[in-house]
Amino acid sequence: KFEANENYYKGEPSVKNIVFQIIENADTAILALQNGEVDAYQMTPQQVKKLDLDANNLTAYSYSEGRVGYLQFNCNRVTDENVRKALLFAMDKKAMDDAAYESDEYYSIPYTFLPTNSQFYTEEGVEKYDQDVDKAKSMLKDAGVSNLKLKLGYISSDPVQSAQALLIQEQLKEVGVEVELAGGDATAVSNAMKDPNNEYDMYLGGYIMGIDPDTFSSLFKNGAAYNYMHYSGYD
């Protein structure tokens, strides 16, 4: 139970108390919302779509949580930069996000490591890798790559990652790349990603890192905790 801070710098809050109730099962939590046992619940777009809001006298609000979902390459395994670029050109980001989030009402596409709602976000000078299948095929050919097989790690219980993994497999097949879907539980996948000798070629994941861009340096720094792509950046 949390009590409002009467001395909050923007003025006294209108809500005096908030109680957070831990409900581990999503279906149980949604039922509690429908029955009026809880006043609010954070839901996925898929859950909202299945729920009759009017019949249950509920209102859905969307907001930007500053989360960035990503596909990362394991640079220890996919070592050729041009191959990585070719794979990016093979993929349709909008189709992947539509499949995962139902509607662009629930997402925006960031073209950098910063979320689009960051005051520091910019696309100036950024290569966007919008889908170009012919270019992807040409780049793979120029790199001397054929019959490429890749393993994709993702959290199998995450509906967003599961939907995106299937589309990645389908889209890369169009350029002659075979993708093995290697879904697992969150702990196992996360631990494997940290291991520089892991067998994943690509990973799906996401992060909420706050508003200070310096925080994001841990994604690129050599040996940093969140440099899951094992990119040789800087010390």
Question: Over which residues does each language-model region extend?
Answer:
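Ligand-site clamp/hinge motif
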Residues: 5-51
